[in-house]
Design a protein with these regions (language model features):
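Beta-rich, blade/repeat-based domains predominating
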Residues: 86-101, 131-145, 177-199, 229-251, ...
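Loop/turn-rich, solvent-exposed surfaces of beta-rich toroidal or solenoidal domains
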Residues: 280-326
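Surface-exposed loop and turn segments in beta-propeller and other repeat-based domains
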Residues: 78-87, 170-183, 221-232, 320-343
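Blade/loop signatures of beta-propeller domains
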Residues: 61-78
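Short loop/turn segments immediately following the C-termini of beta-strands
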Residues: 109-110, 154, 205-206, 245, ...
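Conserved beta-propeller blade signature
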Residues: 104-106, 148-150, 200-201, 251-253, ...
Length: 378
């Protein structure tokens, strides 16, 4: 396979980009860490990693293991979902949120049922959606007392706002108003964040790495970020969220995954600073209480080898626990490289924190597994 035809699946899009043209796949080349790695190399490495589970039975088959360090330790349940795989399959489990009724909402790119809604015990309550082949980002927002969802679809190159039962309220097409996009295929949104005033921030994490801002009606306001060599620039802007933990200085928190970092911006897009997370290919930041949670898709030291874990930071952006990862170590106030320590996860893609502080982990390209649940250890 020629280098120019190498697909971006080596990082995140292995399955759902099948069928796209070589020209479209070129959008993903900037993210490939090693452009000599092609499909059979990835499969070989994945097979080797999977074999590692077979020769480590104490890890692979330990019942209800406890993961993490310090006061953020959790007991793992990898059989949480009670869904019938024949009736309600999943492909990539991309993101999860909890609604005000306590239900856990899962987004998958399986078009038999894009959205699966569970109770906290893992019972499947209902499903909907067959029109989101590239379902990737899922955000919930309380809009004047009514909860709504925002879905980012990689394949459709759109952001879709819906009711909790799937009725479409608004569709945002590619942001030609920016002057940065010639066609929809250049725009591959991965995440949204909604400000208190209803402004919508869209992360073009698999496209050109801009953060595009709209008002609550979907009218274009502006953009920032994008690729470049300055600190304000982004590389794989996979996620974005609103961080209100400092009431005097609320901000946007944006993933720059290939740089192993989060970056902070004002709501007008002015760069504030960078939170380095060496070794961690972080997905979207998730804020709950004083803490920041993030799935780590893979470790920099073991790319494309099912080397993910989950990281937790305190309100000062200090890593305090890694679930399935090495214990965080700071030398002279500098965080040292983190990586997977025990293979309980393959490619974690999102963390949902419920109202009882339980965690739900959605995984990409991990054998079509349903989400895992982790309960706090007191």
């Amino acid at each position: 396979m020629k280098d120019e035809a190498i697909e971006r699946w080596a990082i995140e899009q292995l399955d759902k980009k099948k069928g796209k043209s070589t020209k479209q796949r070129k959008n993903y080349l900037p993210y490939i860490k090693n452009k000599n790695m092609h499909r059979r190399t990835f499969i070989k490495n994945s097979s080797i990693a999977a074999a590692g589970l077979i020769i480590q039975p104490s890890l692979a088959f330990q019942e209800d293991p406890i993961l993490g360090q310090g006061n953020k330790r959790y007991r793992l349940n990898n059989h949480w979902s009670q869904a019938d795989v024949a009736r309600n399959p999943v492909n990539d489990c991309h993101e999860m949120v909890q609604d005000s009724k306590g239900r856990i909402i899962l987004l998958t790119n399986e078009i038999k049922n894009n959205v699966l809604i569970y109770d906290k015990a893992g019972k499947l309550l209902t499903t909907w959606g067959s029109e989101y082949p590239g379902a990737h980002g899922l955000t919930i927002f309380n809009e004047n007392g009514t909860e709504v969802l925002f879905i980012c679809d990689n394949n459709r190159h759109q952001v879709i706002k819906t009711t909790l039962d799937g009725r479409v309220l608004l569709t945002l097409d590619y942001p030609k108003e920016t002057g940065q996009y010639l066609k929809p295929e250049e725009y591959i949104p991965t995440e949204t964040a909604i400000a208190a005033n209803g402004d919508i921030y869209v992360a073009d994490g698999y496209g050109k790495d801009f953060i595009i801002r709209y008002d609550s009606k979907g009218r274009y306001i502006g953009y920032f970020g994008g690729r470049g060599d300055e600190p304000k620039h982004l590389l794989n802007a996979h996620g974005v969220c609103i961080d209100n933990r400092d009431a005097n200085r609320p901000c946007l928190l944006v993933t720059s995954r290939q740089q192993n970092a989060f970056k902070r911006y004002t709501f007008n897009g002015e760069y504030i600073d960078t939170i380095p997370l060496p070794g961690a290919w972080v997905c979207r930041p998730v804020i709950k209480g004083d803490y920041l949670y993030a799935a780590v898709l893979q470790s920099s030291s073991s790319l494309s080898k099912q080397s993910g874990f989950v990281t937790i930071l305190d309100k000062n952006f200090k890593v305090i626990s890694n679930l399935g990862g090495t214990e965080p170590l700071y030398l002279n106030n500098k965080l040292q490289e983190m990586k997977q320590a025990i293979k309980y996860f393959d490619y974690p893609h999102d963390v949902c924190v419920d109202d009882e502080e339980n965690l739900y982990i959605a995984q990409w390209n991990s054998g079509k597994v349903y989400p895992y649940k982790l309960s706090p250890v007191i």
